A protein has these predicted regions:
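Sec-dependent bacterial lipoprotein signal peptides
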Residues: 1-17
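A short glycine-rich beta-turn/N-cap micro-motif
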Residues: 31, 53-57
Length: 139
């Protein structure tokens, strides 16, 4: 009986693990970078992303030393072929760039109020917060 209970618990635990399902509509709106959960990271500025339904994203960069500037880029959310097979839930900024100079991020968390990205091909480390790892809250 213990074996059966253990097997059932293992099956239920495995079934409860589901991958993040990212829908393009979930990303729409304005997101502000927020690193309050990472006290060891002290940015000198920040970024605000406004994702629009037409596939464009308006980005506002603010920097204490260099000043503010705005850019508009295109984006797509979906699956791409990665070095270890298909990567799902990927955000590509400027995916049309023929030289692949656009940015690619794995969306690792997306809720109504919070979003996290990890640059493709990198792993989370304290030193990469702000460049390879980004954390946002909805504005």
């Amino acid at each position: 009986m213990k074996k059966i209970s253990l097997i059932i618990m293992a099956i239920l635990a495995f079934a409860g693990c589901s991958k993040l399902e990212v829908n393009k509509e979930n990303i729409l709106g304005t997101w502000v970078d927020d690193y309050s959960a990472y006290p060891y990271y002290a940015p000198e500025g920040g970024e605000t992303y406004t994702f629009n339904a037409d596939g464009t994203v308006d980005i506002h960069y603010y920097d204490v030393f260099a000043g503010d500037h705005d850019v508009q880029r295109t984006y797509t959310v979906g699956a791409v072929e990665g070095t270890s097979g298909m990567e799902n839930d990927v955000l590509l900024l400027d995916p049309h760039m023929s030289d692949y100079s656009g940015d690619g991020f794995k969306i690792v968390k997306l809720t109504k109020t919070e979003m996290e990205w990890q640059r493709l091909g990198t792993t989370f480390q304290k030193g990469t917060v702000g460049s390879d790892f980004k954390h946002f809250r909805r504005k």
